[in-house]
Amino acid sequence: MRDTLAIVGGGPAGMMAAIRAAEVLGNGRRVVLFDKNDRLGRKIYLTGKGRCNLTNRRSWEEFAPHIHPNQGFLKHAFRAFSNEDVIRFFEEELGVPTVTQQGQRVYPASLVAGDVARALERRVQELGVDVRRGVTVSSLAELADFGAVIIATGGKSYPVTGSTGDGYRFAEEAGHTVTSVFPSETALLPKDYDPGLPGLEMKNVGLHLYIDRALVESEQGDFNFTNDGLESGIAYRLSRRAVWALYNGQRVDIVLDLKPALTEEQLINRLQRAPQLWFSSRSQKNARGSKNHPLATPVFNRHSEPSDTRHTGLDPASLRSFLPEVLVAPFLRANPDLTVENLPQRLKSWPFRIIDYKGFERAVVTAGGVSLKEIVPKTMASRLRPGLYFCGEVLDLDGDTGGYNLQIAFSTGSLAGISAAKYLL
C-alpha cells in the first residue's frame, strides 16, 4: 500500500483532494477515501441555508480581506485553483450550472446544496476512488501502511455531521501545534434580550463591534434576530472577533445603526421639516407654543406603554416613518427616556451588551486549528512529517460568510490532492 494515498474526511476538501489525486495518479484505486458518515459531503447539505454558497467571485484583492487569520497563506492555493476555476469545474466538469447573486456570491443555479454534494461524490466514484463510508479512523497509526495521508476532517462545527475535531488529534499525534479553536459565524446573545426581537429580519443596517469599549470593526448589510441572539449575515462577520474576545474575558458590545445611510444631522433635519409627524393631533396646538418645539418632547417614558400618548403628546405610531412596525415596541422598551431630541442619536446607536454565544453545535465555522507555520503553503504538506498533508477547516484558516470557506476547502483540497499524488509518483 506504499503507493496508495489515504484521505481522512469526505467533505468538500476531502472530495476535492480525492478527485485531484485520482486524476494525477491516473488510477482511482490508489486513492482511499475514509468517511465516518454513510454519505459523503454531509455538511455541504447545510451550507448557505441549504443552497450552498460555492464561492465568491471577488478578485483576490477583494477576496483576501475576508480570510483569517493569515490571508497570505491561502494565496498560492487560490492562484492554483481560484474562484473562477471552481465555477468552471462545477459547470464544465460536473455539469452543475451556477448563478451569481448579491455580494458576488455563487450558488448552484438550482439553489439546492444537495446537487453540489452529489456531483462531487459522483465524480469521485467515476474516477474509481476506493470510498469507505461509515469507517472511523481513530489514529494516524492505523494509516501507517499508506504512502501518503491527507487530513481533511473539518473542524468542530456542526458535530452532528461528523465534524468532531478528530483531525486535531491526528495533527498532535504527528507533533503539530493546534491553536485554540472556537466557534465562528455563530449567534451572539445580548444581555436582557427583548422577547419581541426574535424573528425579526434586519435589512440594510449597520453593526459596530466594540471590545472593551473600543470600536474594532463595523459592517453594513442584513442580519436576523433569532431565539439565540444576533445571527446570520453581518452578525456572523463580527462573531469571530466577538467570540474570541468573550473567550478571553473581554467586554463585548454591538451597536446597531438602524439608519446607516443617514447622519444624525440628516435625521434631525427630517424631524424639523415634518414636526407634525411627531405629535398627536390633540397636542399639536400646545406643542407649537412651546419654546422647545420641535426637539424636546418625550415620546415615551417608563410609566407608559408604547401606544400610550397621554403622557407625551406624541403618537408612537409616527415612529413607523423611521422603523418597521414590528420594531417600534422593542425600540421604545430599549429607550424609555426617548425624546424627539435624542431620537436621531438612538436610531444610530442601539447598544447590545453581548454576554454569550452559541457553541460548535450551531456554529457554521470553526476558527483556529493546525498551525499554518507548520504547513507548506505551496503544497499543503506538513513541515514535520513527510507524506502528511492537511486541507480545509482543520487548518487554522477560515473565512467570512459569503462563499469564502468553501473556496478555502476547494483550493486547499485541490492543492493537497495534487501534491500528495506527486509525492507518490
Predicted segment positions?
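A conserved FAD-binding loop/helix module that cradles the flavin
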Residues: S157-A174, L397-L425
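Glycine-rich loop(s) and the adjacent beta-strand/alpha-helix scaffold that form part
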Residues: A148-D194
